[in-house]
Amino acid sequence: MTRFTYILFFALSFQCVCAQRYSRVHLDVSKTEDLSRLKEMPLALDHAHWKLEVGEVVIEVSDFELGLIQQADIPYHVEIDDLEDFYSKRLRQQQDIVWTKNVNCDSTSAPLDPTNFELGSMGGYYTYQEMLDDLDSMHSLFPNLISAKELIHTFTTEEGRPLYWVRISNTPDTDDPSKPEILYTSNHHAREAAALSINMYSMWYILENYATDEDLRYLVDNVEMYFVPLVNPDGWVYNQTIQPNGGGMWRKNRRDNGNNTFGVDLNRNYGYEWGGVGSSGNGNSDVYRGTTPFSEAESQALKWFTEQHAFQIALNYHTAANMLLHPWGYTDNFECNDHDRFIAFKSWMTEVNGYLNIQSSLLYEAAGDSDDWMYGDTSTKPKILAMTPECGTNSDGFWPPTSRILPLCRENLPQNLRGAYILLDYLRVEDLSSDALSVQGAIDVSMQRLGLPESSGFIVDLESLDPAVTVNTSAKLVSGLSYGESILDSFNYTIDTQSLSNPEVGFVLSVNNGTHIFRDTLYKRVSVVNPALSIDGTTLSPFENQGSSSWSTTTEDFVSAPTSITDSPNDDYENQTTQTLLLTPIINLSNAQDALIRFAAKWDIEADYDYVQFEALRVSSTGLPNDWLPLCGKYTNAGTADQDEGMPLYDGVQNTWVEEEVDMTEFLGDSIQLRFQLVSDNFVTGDGFYFDDFKIYIGGSIDSVINNVSDLNGLDKFATIIPNPAQHAIRLETTQPWMGQVQILNTLGQEVMNYSLDSESQQVHFDVGHLPSGSYYVHLLNADQITIVLPLWIQ
């Protein structure tokens, strides 16, 4: 200990924490010495929000801990004075709110909530008895899939409560040594309310979907899934007692330490590197580690339980930081031996919820936690690949609003299931191709070995569900991959447009591991292959800054040389700013049958706070606009309470270029405008948002696609087709001379005519009498890479 730490320990060690008040405070650690002192202090920094770019840490602390901060002379200000009162009032206000999905985004991959999962009576969270009743109901309804709740040996807590466990398996009453095992726990810390709900939700989902989901049935038949849903029952009941509507801030268990202090932090009481940094020997502290390793009945019970089994993976649920953490926690001086393996499978586990995938100590060093002991101590049990999900955002806090319970459960369900799939022979196969198909091309896929067992290989195949679509590539044998290794491949296809009855076509992408076939159905649509509007980022036009916005082209990075478009060229974006970039042409989808937008993008935006949205505005027939609607793409995620909550947006870090794709079919029949908008708060900033090669694809329209074409690159170049509809010949007239290419395409994107205008002209004649009756597009492409599209109807 430093002299500073000793002084604080003895000065405060005799204060009672029987009726502590908790506050949310912002610490100013812009000075290096203040940050160093903070890291030495016995505070629960594992749930702090670190904003070191602006020299700030946001933390929820007790009166005792606030006293430590004051004596350390670290500057701070209080955001919320009484957190129990704040959480309790917020939960009471939210009791009658029903959460609904983001209607702007495709939800086909979202789970259907289990019918037996219900919100509890404690602000939406379970009471202790409600949890026990639910475990009994699970066994009563699904006795062939889940065991009756059982005590962990004879261990009881300070207040006489046992710890319960259940097993989900197709043989739930038998411990089958041939099956790999995974452990799920919740609530080492009593106040982290969402953790219990997440695991109870997952259990109900597995039980209810076993009969109808082939992949889930394969998982349950071949893996034993163990749940200890409440590690800290005494602390949970204490919070229930002091705040029956939810919001209690007690973290530790309820041991009477004998010196007028109560409670041990169970996640500092494990034996691996016990007693080190991030824990305290002071019973007042929220990170009090106890008198000895495993001094507590709760940690003893978990130790004994893991020693009776051969768990390969463990997920110990906590809240809140939107992270999935792995060892080491006690030091950041080096990585664990399985660091690369953790990173590989955690990247898949967090694909849906977008949680940060890092080593625990990179957030904050903490000795004596569950993950380090499960992974590091192999003297009495095998090594366990243990992880800690920290679920929810900083604004969710320890007691998220009632309306956030289901979203948190939903976003962690794939994480729970994928953690179990890793125990099997598993190959991750991802479709990398566009949702819009040309008449012929390829479905590109990536394939990565993520299953822990050694594999003899996989057979990967793609089958068409439409007789008009032929897959020309045979099934592939994938073998010899090292763990986490990823390869790219493709399946070629052709489409017989004459026999195609529906523009939407389906494929089945399958992976056979020798004992089970995983199947994923891909839905694509045959659409126009040439864009109605193409902007290569060489100039800002036809985009236009709104107000004082400063979007511009940049040579910093691009997909197509020499520039792309970004919100803050050659610099980070500013704090407390809104930067809006409007696409000035109005897009007319009045008679379109299909619409799609693609652009290349990359970004560096403060996660959970700042964001960029790509939005559309319906322009009504009266000329009065409706509200701007955020658009959902392949790479958007739902906003937090500190952003546009629940709406699709871009945040976090995407360092490499990705091809974003936005389905616009919900706007068919409308005229719309489009814009990009960046919004920032007053703290951390980043490099911002870049996009390039922006293209709008329109299918099936017989009306003009782009209005206000005079705005394109500042050129007043508008074209007219006479006559239209036509039978034999057409005359194409432009208001100003035009030089470039003229293409005529059918609605499937096939080029049926091509004509070069080698000299500037305002009029050209075409014979179209040989074309079949129907809808066509006339594309005018100039040297500036601007495409104007006009409809043509042949009678």
For every predicted segment, state its role.
Residues 4-5, 15, 19, 712-795:
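C-terminal outer-membrane/trafficking sorting elements
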Residues 470-500:
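Intrinsically disordered, low-complexity Pro/Gly/Ser/Thr-rich segments with frequent PxxP/GP/PP motifs
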Residues 495-530:
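Terminal connector regions
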Residues 609-611, 680-699:
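Extracellular carbohydrate recognition
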Residues 28, 245-440, 470-471:
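Metallocarboxypeptidase
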Residues 427-437, 531-544, 575-576, 697-722, ...:
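Residue-level detector of functionally pivotal "anchor" positions at catalytic/ligand-binding pockets or at interdomain
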Residues 589-604, 612, 671-680, 694:
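Extracellular beta-strand-rich recognition modules
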Residues 531-580, 628-659:
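Extracellular glycan-recognition surfaces and repeat-rich motifs
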